[in-house]
């Protein structure tokens, strides 16, 4: 039997854009190599750079699993530096960001550890990231119980994005996505906000507090942003609801002008997660003349490369 202490030795650490400065020219190396996946990285980098200069509405869309990794700090930094001005993500993002902002520590592990043993040791496994029980559910429950009553005292009904700003305001961790979003007033849109520990705890507390979340106001906000922008672009990392919500709303302005997908999903099963940009064109979610790229690979490798290229 492995000791718990032996597994929980090496914590996951957040990175910032400054950590990538020495790699800012790495895409030029891939441009020389060019073949196969290298071309996608080069094309995606060029599109991102043009999008950031040209599009006034810039979506950062990603799934929650990435927030358990060191990409969390990088996402926060991309927001703080103004590269993106709206986030669309999933409920677990809020869980991981809050947990890690208030003392939760995640650790480096392995995909191959015995999961029954981990359960006995009170450790969750998220891929090869280890999440001790005490770093997750309990932390989030305590945060919601502490802050929601004071938020609800002034606001009996609140849009979800404003609620997340309220929590972000109460975070001091510089690596926090919610903190960065609050500071820059970047809305964090979570269409599936009830799906996770944070959402469940909101539901539980709502039974004791006169408090409601108005998701229609989130829809009104994203509608106003899409309808009023001149051009829109998106970096979409992963699939699922965060990907679909991003491209869904852009159909009402005849589609995204720029789109970069980072994914491991394939299109043969007809899934939204695996669908390429060309399929979104048929749904009016990406313009026929839009600049787009699909990069296949692990986001923990691809995203730092793309982010580094923005510094060159």
Swiss-Prot record:
Keywords recorded for this protein, A-Z: Hypusine biosynthesis, NAD, Transferase
Alphabetized InterPro entries for the sequence: Deoxyhypus_synthase_arc, Deoxyhypusine_synthase, Deoxyhypusine_synthase_sf, DHS-like_NAD/FAD-binding_dom
Cofactor or coenzyme needed: NAD(+)
Active site (record annotation): 285 (nucleophile)
Single GO term (MF): deoxyhypusine synthase activity
Family to which this protein belongs: Belongs to the deoxyhypusine synthase family.
Function: Catalyzes the NAD-dependent oxidative cleavage of spermidine and the subsequent transfer of the butylamine moiety of spermidine to the epsilon-amino group of a specific lysine residue of the eIF-5A precursor protein to form the intermediate deoxyhypusine residue.
Name under which the protein is recorded: Probable deoxyhypusine synthase
């Amino acid at each position: 039997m492995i000791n718990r202490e032996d597994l929980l030795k090496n914590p996951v650490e957040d990175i910032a854009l400054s950590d990538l400065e020495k790699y800012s020219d790495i895409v030029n190396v891939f441009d020389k190599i060019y073949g196969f996946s290298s071309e996608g990285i080069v094309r995606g980098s060029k599109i991102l750079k043009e999008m950031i200069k040209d599009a006034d509405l810039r979506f950062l869309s990603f799934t929650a699993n990435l927030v358990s990794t060191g990409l969390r700090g990088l996402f926060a930094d991309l927001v703080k530096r103004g590269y993106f001005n709206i986030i669309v993500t999933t409920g677990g993002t809020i869980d991981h960001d809050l947990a890690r902002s208030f003392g939760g520590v995640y650790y480096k592990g392995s995909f191959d550890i015995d999961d029954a043993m981990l359960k006995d040791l009170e450790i969750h496994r998220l891929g090869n990231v280890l999440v001790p029980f005490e770093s997750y559910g309990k932390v989030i429950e305590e945060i919601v119980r502490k802050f929601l009553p004071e938020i609800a005292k002034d606001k009996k009904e609140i849009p979800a994005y404003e609620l997340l700003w309220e929590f972000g305001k109460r975070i001091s961790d510089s690596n926090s996505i919610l903190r960065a979003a609050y500071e820059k007033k970047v809305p964090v849109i979570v269409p599936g906000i009830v799906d996770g520990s944070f959402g469940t705890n909101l539901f539980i507390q709502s039974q004791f507090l006169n408090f409601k979340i108005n998701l229609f106001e989130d829809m009104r906000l994203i509608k106003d942003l899409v309808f009023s922008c001149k051009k829109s672009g998106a970096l979409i990392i992963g699939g699922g609801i965060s990907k679909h919500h991003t491209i869904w709303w852009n159909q009402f302005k005849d589609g995204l002008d720029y789109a970069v997908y980072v994914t491991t999903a394939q299109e043969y099963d007809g899934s939204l997660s695996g669908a390429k940009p060309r399929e979104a064109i048929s749904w009016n979610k990406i313009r026929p003349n839009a600049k787009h790229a699909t990069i296949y690979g692990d986001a923990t490798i691809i995203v730092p490369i793309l982010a580094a290229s923005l510094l060159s």
